[in-house]
Amino acid sequence: EDDYARLGTKAQMNPPLRTKADQAALWAGIKDGTIDTIGTDHAPHTLVEKAKPYGEAPSGVPGIETLLPLLLTAVSEKKINLEDVVRITKTNAEAIFRLPSNEDIVLVDLKKTKLVRDEDMKTKCGWSPFAGQTLTGWPTHTICQEKIYKCS
C-alpha cells in the first residue's frame, strides 16, 4: 500500500501489490512449502512508458536483477532459509517444468550489502522498484557452461 504512494504508476502490475498481511502470508507459504516456485516476469518498461496515467501505463516491473538479493535478504531477516531459496528458484522449477538439471552455479556473498540504485540497473529500463533499499546477499559469480562470469 505504501509502495503505491512512493512509486505511482511504476507500481502498476498484475497481480497488483497487496497488503503487508498478504506479503507475510507469501513468506509463510514459501517457508511451509505451499509455494512451489517463484520467478519474475521481468517487464522492463521504461520510465517514459511508466509515466503515463493509470490505465495507460503498462503493467509490470523489472525484477530479474533483484530477485536473488531480495530472497537472500529474506534469509538474512530469518523469513526463509537458504534451502527454501534453492527449492523455489531451482529444484522445484526443474521438477515442475521438467527442465534438465545442469551444473550451472551462482556464487553469492551472504554478507554483502548493497544499495539498489536505478543507475546500476543493467536492463533497458534503467530503474528498479527497489531503488533506495539496501539488500543483503548478492551474487558474486556465475559459472555457466564452464565459463565464469563476475557479477558487478
Where are these regions (language model features)?
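Histidine/acidic residue-rich metal-binding segments in metalloenzymes
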Residues: 1-38
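Low-complexity, flexible helical/coil segments
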Residues: 2, 21-31, 72-79, 138-148
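Glycine-/small-residue-rich active-site loops that bind phosphorylated ligands and cofactors
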Residues: 18, 95, 113
